[in-house]
Amino acid sequence: MCIRDRNKDDYVAGFPPHPHRGIETVTYMLNGEFEHQDSTGAKGIMTSGDVQWMKTGRGIIHSEMPAMKEGKLLGFQLWINMPAKMKKNKPEYLYIKGNELGKHEDSEKIVKVIAGKYEKAEGPEKNHNVDPIYFHVILNEKKEFNFDVPSGHNSFVYLSLIHISEPTRHRG
């Protein structure tokens, strides 16, 4: 499951304390700042490019609240069902700075590796209950990205088209 929230009126309230169990949540911030606090004692501010990996196991209570006064908040949260044998484990919280992510860069693209491996770049978290592959791919114009999804994996692609051009200048 992927949750993406772009509702400007909605994010101001954030997500006050609420429980999870039996899942892993992987939150990747594209823009903005979020404050995380949970029942394991973990607390911190996620900023653009950072990853929060929460393994809820037998249960965790956490909150995610905006840590910014203005601007747009944009991020993705992937929910991964934990195998039955892991659902009684002690919860864990991992905070990964954006500069710790694996990164592949060539003339056509940048691939930030949140989990898994692309070319020689690897995601920083290796202790997985499943074998996730999670990339943020930035393509140059008219370029493409190809990746063979391993047999047995489920997959999805979220595509966001952003075209950046020079601003038009008007003379008055």
Listing of model-derived features with the role each one plays in the protein:
Residues G57-M86, R169:
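Ligand-binding loop in jelly-roll beta-barrel domains
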Residues R21-G41, D50-V51, V149-S165:
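Glycine- and acidic-residue-biased ligand/ion/polar-headgroup-sensing regions
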Residues G49, G57, N140-E144, G152:
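Tight coil/turn sites that cap or link beta-strands
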Residues M82-K109:
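Long amphipathic alpha-helical segments that form oligomerization/scaffold cores
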Residues E24, G44, D50-Q52, H62, ...:
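Generic beta-strand structural signal
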